[in-house]
């Protein structure tokens, strides 16, 4: 089988999945990078040395031509954020395509009233709704958004982004976490308004007032950093809070491996939320906003983590307090989360299932997975969690 994966650039979100494809297919797999990465993303640690399976289409006319040939000749094309012209001929031939997509309407359904975007939605999606094209959903809200656009109904499959599978055993992770005295709560991400780190600090302050003992570690940088540090002082959290600054993805993962609880507070502007994936894989007890695209796929409330209502201080306090007053639940949730990620939500499983499902589809057969990557998406709306 030959699979070609088109996306704007090769980065740490895709590297492990691509390596898994290469392990399965060897020379049958190619990643086509269609543009150079922006400098600010490279500085954030997103950039990766290009393995031999990466074709940079923008480097030369010859590479561009090769990419166009792969788009037509491959058995399967996975199509992320890339110029649509690469798949025009493939669409006309009705050959198998998986469109790799976050939710298209995360800013709201009003987007369909903007003429430029309405034209784009029609050209890229609605007119192709009956073609041999399926959605790899990098958001639990994908299916409902595309249903609103009358596109890909019944053809959306659970997917996401797949950083490296955790290499340590849960026992090894628990040993690292048990060194924390008191419990350590980690928040990691860019300090942007949409990430709502302020909500976490406010909820943490309330829990501290109630007598719970813990420390806080804040990883990241960004435009809200000054405000958050001032808020930390105002809420009398400075003595238990450490700001680590910007860390690489690998260094952030190391902090997750040592944390007891991980809190993710983003609003609906968060497309996926890879930190949820990484923290669950690291055996943390994760408390996640219901708005993040990854949450409904990866977090089963009370089983593999806790979910709180996005933007609700009271809901977040309740989720935090539930763990702080029963510390034994922290390892219990962390273990179940770790096991779920090891068995289902990892690059090897995701790549293997795409290959297997593609083999079925190419023979006009159906392959059904009950859970995990490539299981069917439900229609989930913003108000699903109360």
Per-region residue spans from a language model:
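Membrane-proximal helix-turn-helix segments that form the acceptor-binding/catalytic region
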Residues: 115-135, 144, 148-149
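Conserved donor-binding/catalytic core segment of Leloir-type glycosyltransferases
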Residues: 175-195, 201-204, 217
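Short alpha-helical donor nucleotide-sugar binding micro-motif in glycosyltransferases
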Residues: 246-247, 254-259
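Acidic donor-binding loop of glycosyltransferase active sites
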Residues: 257-271, 284
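Conserved acidic donor-binding segment of nucleotide-sugar-dependent glycosyltransferases
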Residues: 300-302, 306-313, 322-327
């Amino acid at each position: 089988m030959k699979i070609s994966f088109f996306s704007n650039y090769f980065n740490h979100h895709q590297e492990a999945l691509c390596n898994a494809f290469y392990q399965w297919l060897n020379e049958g797999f190619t990643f086509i990078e269609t543009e150079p990465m922006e400098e600010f993303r490279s500085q954030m640690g997103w950039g990766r040395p290009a393995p031999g399976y990466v074709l940079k289409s923008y480097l030369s006319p010859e590479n561009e031509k090769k990419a166009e040939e792969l788009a037509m000749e491959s058995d399967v094309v996975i199509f992320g954020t890339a110029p649509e012209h690469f798949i025009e001929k493939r669409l006309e031939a009705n050959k198998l395509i998986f469109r790799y997509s976050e939710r298209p309407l995360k800013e709201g359904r009003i987007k369909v009233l903007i003429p430029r975007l309405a034209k784009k939605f029609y050209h890229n999606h609605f007119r192709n709704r009956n073609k041999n094209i399926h959605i790899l959903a990098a958001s639990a809200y994908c299916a409902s958004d595309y249903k609103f656009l009358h596109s890909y109904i019944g053809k959306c499959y659970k997917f996401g982004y797949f950083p490296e599978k955790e290499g340590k055993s849960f026992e090894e992770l628990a040993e690292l976490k048990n060194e924390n005295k008191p419990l350590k709560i980690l928040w990691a991400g860019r300090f942007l308004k949409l990430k709502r780190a302020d909500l976490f600090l406010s909820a943490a302050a309330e829990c501290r007032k109630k007598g719970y003992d813990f420390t806080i570690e804040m990883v990241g940088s960004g435009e809200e950093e000054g405000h958050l540090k001032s808020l930390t002082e105002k809420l009398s959290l400075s003595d238990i809070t450490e700001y680590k600054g910007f860390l690489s993805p690998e260094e952030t993962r190391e902090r997750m491996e040592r944390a007891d609880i991980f809190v993710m507070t983003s609003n609906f502007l968060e497309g996926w939320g890879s930190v949820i994936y990484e923290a669950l894989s690291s055996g943390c007890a994760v408390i996640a906003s219901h708005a993040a695209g990854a949450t409904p796929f990866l977090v089963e409330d009370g089983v593999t983590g806790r979910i709180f209502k996005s933007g609700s201080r009271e809901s977040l306090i309740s989720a935090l307090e539930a763990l702080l007053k029963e510390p034994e639940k922290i390892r219990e949730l962390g273990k179940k989360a770790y096991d779920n990620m090891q068995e289902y939500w990892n690059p090897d499983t995701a790549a293997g299932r795409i290959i297997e499902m593609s083999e079925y589809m190419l023979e006009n057969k159906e392959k059904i997975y009950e859970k995990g990557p490539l299981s069917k998406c439900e229609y989930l709306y913003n108000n699903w969690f109360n």
